[in-house]
Amino acid sequence: MIQQESQLKVADNTGAKKVKCFKVLGGSRRRYATVGDVIVCSVRDVEPNSSIKKGDVIKAVIVRTRRHITRKDGSTLKFDTNSCVIIDDKGNPKGTRIFGPVAREIRDRGFIKISSLAPEVI
């Protein structure tokens, strides 16, 4: 579960390393986000010479959470980190590579490009 002030790692090659969530999109008073949800973030840490600068406000989709995901068949899944992928306004990833596995729920939510770029879909 991701909420306001949560810090996430960035799992793509856009140049941002860490972001801080300050809004969960989808509803007037929505508090928590999970895998596949879109959040609005502020960039907190960047690599040198990257196109994204510190303090930029961006949209991102969550691809991994430490909180377990319960699937319809009863199985659960959780990851070691809270991670996201930076997207543009149309929902396409800004980066050209994605690092680490992503959950299958990403494809179910309509982010097919992200799931195809990922090295492993769990």
UniProtKB/Swiss-Prot annotation:
Q: Which PROSITE patterns match?
A: RIBOSOMAL_L14
Which controlled-vocabulary keywords does the entry list?
Ribonucleoprotein, Ribosomal protein, RNA-binding, rRNA-binding
Provide one Gene Ontology biological process annotation. Answer: translation
Q: Pfam families, alphabetically?
A: Ribosomal_L14 (PF00238)
User: Can you list the GO cellular component terms from the UniProt entry?
Assistant: cytosolic large ribosomal subunit
Q: Which InterPro entries does the record cross-reference, listed alphabetically?
A: Ribosomal_uL14 (IPR000218), Ribosomal_uL14_bac-type (IPR005745), Ribosomal_uL14_CS (IPR019972), Ribosomal_uL14_sf (IPR036853)
- Return the SUPFAM superfamilies for the record: Ribosomal protein L14 (SSF50193)
Q: Which GO terms describe its molecular function?
A: large ribosomal subunit rRNA binding; structural constituent of ribosome
Task: List each coiled-coil range.
Answer: none
Q: Could you tell me which PANTHER family the record lists for this protein?
A: 50S/60S RIBOSOMAL PROTEIN L14/L23, LARGE RIBOSOMAL SUBUNIT PROTEIN UL14M
Protein family according to the UniProt entry: Belongs to the universal ribosomal protein uL14 family.
**Record's subunit section:** Part of the 50S ribosomal subunit. Forms a cluster with proteins L3 and L19. In the 70S ribosome, L14 and L19 interact and together make contacts with the 16S rRNA in bridges B5 and B8.
Its function, per the record, reads: Binds to 23S rRNA. Forms part of two intersubunit bridges in the 70S ribosome.
Q: What is this protein called?
A: Large ribosomal subunit protein uL14
Write the gene name: rplN
